Swiss-Prot record:
Tissue specificity statement from the Swiss-Prot or TrEMBL entry: Constitutively expressed.
UniProt gene name: ATG8A
Lipid-modified residues, Phosphatidylethanolamine amidated glycine kind: 117
Protein family per UniProt: Belongs to the ATG8 family.
Name of protein: Autophagy-related protein 8A
Keywords: Autophagy, Cytoplasm, Cytoplasmic vesicle, Cytoskeleton, Lipoprotein, Membrane, Microtubule, Protein transport, Transport, Ubl conjugation pathway, Vacuole
PANTHER family assigned: MICROTUBULE-ASSOCIATED PROTEINS 1A/1B LIGHT CHAIN 3-RELATED
Quaternary structure annotation from Swiss-Prot or TrEMBL: Interacts with ATG4.
Annotated Gene Ontology cellular component terms: autophagosome membrane; cytoplasmic vesicle; microtubule
GO biological process, one term: autophagy
Membrane topology of the entry: Lipid-anchor
Site feature location: Cleavage: 117-118
Organism: Oryza sativa subsp. indica (Rice)
Length: 119
């Protein structure tokens, strides 16, 4: 299971207020929290909070994550939403609408292995 350190560091009310402010100010963007899954050998990401264009695909966002963690091309990376691999062609806006947390953020975890087994 992924660490939820962002949730532990920030109370629900503060996260809700922040996501509401972000969505109001940047209506064409999605507030995303990206955290490394437990027990994976890929590097830790330098920044957890992202403001992603709504029309970005999951595949394009995975590319952003790869760049941020400086992962070499031959290494695999998997990005999960609620322990499921979202389709790479899906728009981030669609994934957000289906999977956003009660605090208004979309939580994604990444791993070097397909740890949850289902595509």
């Amino acid at each position: 299971m992924a660490r939820t350190s962002f949730k532990l560091e920030h109370p629900l009310e503060r996260r809700q207020a922040e996501s509401a402010r972000i969505r109001e100010k940047y209506s064409d963007r999605i507030p995303v929290i990206v955290e490394k899954a437990d027990k994976t050998d890929v590097p830790e990401i330098d920044k957890k909070k992202y403001l992603v264009p709504a029309d970005l695909t999951v595949g394009q966002f995975v590319y952003v994550v790869r760049k941020r963690i400086k992962l070499s091309p031959e290494k695999a990376i998997f990005v999960f939403v609620k322990n499921t691999l979202p389709p790479t062609a899906s728009l981030m806006s669609a994934i957000y609408e289906e999977n956003k947390d009660e605090d208004g953020f979309l939580y994604m975890t990444y791993s070097g292995e397909n740890t949850f087994g289902s595509a």
